[in-house]
Design a protein with these regions (language model features):
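Beta-strand-rich binding-surface signature
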Residues: 10, 21, 52, 85, ...
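Structured nucleic-acid-interacting core domains from mobile-element enzymes and related host factors
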Residues: 114-137
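C-terminal reverse transcriptase regions that engage the nucleic-acid substrate
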Residues: 3-121, 224
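RNase H-like nuclease module associated with reverse transcription
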Residues: 9, 132, 150, 168-257
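RNase H-like nuclease fold core
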Residues: 76, 136-177
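Amphipathic alpha-helical interaction motifs in eukaryotic regulatory proteins
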Residues: 31-35, 56, 73, 77, ...
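Residues immediately flanking
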Residues: 13, 26-27, 127, 139, ...
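Conserved pre-motif C helix in the palm subdomain of viral-like polymerases
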Residues: 69-85, 140, 178-190
Length: 257
């Protein structure tokens, strides 16, 4: 066995070892994507999706090459491993991968324009971080204008370092904002990719969360909207809010102190 020193590259992930922590990014891969889709010279934008954007199956627009669109969306998927800031936007456009139109392509290309201006961004893991596990979860209500299903987002931190994140449309309808929040809280509490979403009764979710609290497995706390880190995973935000939450989830420039 040969000692080749500290890891600097692994499966497309660039790892920068620093005195105060580790910085992980995909700068080279991002440049490859921009070059592949002729976006190296595009004008950059401040957010991956414009605030208020909603896509629908009834959107107008000319049909575009489905192979090109699938390739573009597929290329973005791998980036979400180190770029949680594009996860929500990626989730929205990937929902329409089988029905690409010029309207949807425009929204997808905006993600590339955002990446152009943030090529050197990545995740920073501080060496001085504690080991307290903290999770944030949130949900919109009936946010999908086609089927009125809700979007759930959560993010987990170990100390100040983000370790897990998710942005998913729930496969069931929720009948109130309260129920949508219970679904989000249950999903976050379990943080389980095989969570059985077909258990529809709200009482089941309530009792599950209550049992976890009683056993002191979790501590549930109210979080003000301004401090809700999971908001970046459930809706397109204005730049000021997006920038603040992007920083909150540990994203920074490579040489930023």
């Amino acid at each position: 066995m040969t000692d080749v020193g500290l890891m600097s590259y692994y499966l497309g992930l660039e790892v920068k070892q620093m005195e105060d922590g580790i910085f992980i990014s995909q700068e080279s891969y991002t440049k490859e994507i921009l070059k592949k889709f002729n976006m190296l010279d595009c004008n950059s934008v401040n957010t991956p999706m414009e605030s208020g954007t909603k896509l629908s199956k009834f959107d107008e627009g000319e049909k575009v090459d489905p192979i090109f669109f699938k390739s573009l969306v597929g290329s973005l998927r791998y980036l979400t491993y180190t770029r949680p800031d594009i996860l929500f936007a990626f989730g929205v456009v990937s929902h329409f991968v089988e029905a690409p139109t010029s309207t949807r392509l425009k929204v997808t290309r905006r993600i590339l324009c955002y990446l152009k201006g943030t090529i050197d961004f990545g995740l920073f893991y501080s060496s001085s971080s504690d080991f307290n596990l903290v999770g944030f979860c949130d949900s919109d209500y009936a946010g999908d204008i086609d089927d009125r299903k809700s979007k759930t987002g959560f993010v987990f931190f170990l100390g100040d370092s983000v370790i897990s994140w998710s942005s998913k449309k729930r496969p069931i309808l929720t009948l109130s904002t309260c129920e949508a929040e219970y679904v989000a809280a249950t999903s976050c509490t379990r943080e389980d990719p095989v969570y059985h979403n077909r258990s529809k009764h709200i009482d089941t979710r309530y009792r599950f969360i209550k049992e976890c609290i009683t056993k002191k497995e979790v501590e549930l706390k109210y979080v003000k909207s301004h401090d809700q880190a999971a908001d970046i995973f459930i809706k397109p935000l204005k730049f000021e809010d997006f920038q603040r939450l992007r920083s909150r989830i540990g994203m920074k420039k490579k040489n930023q102190n």
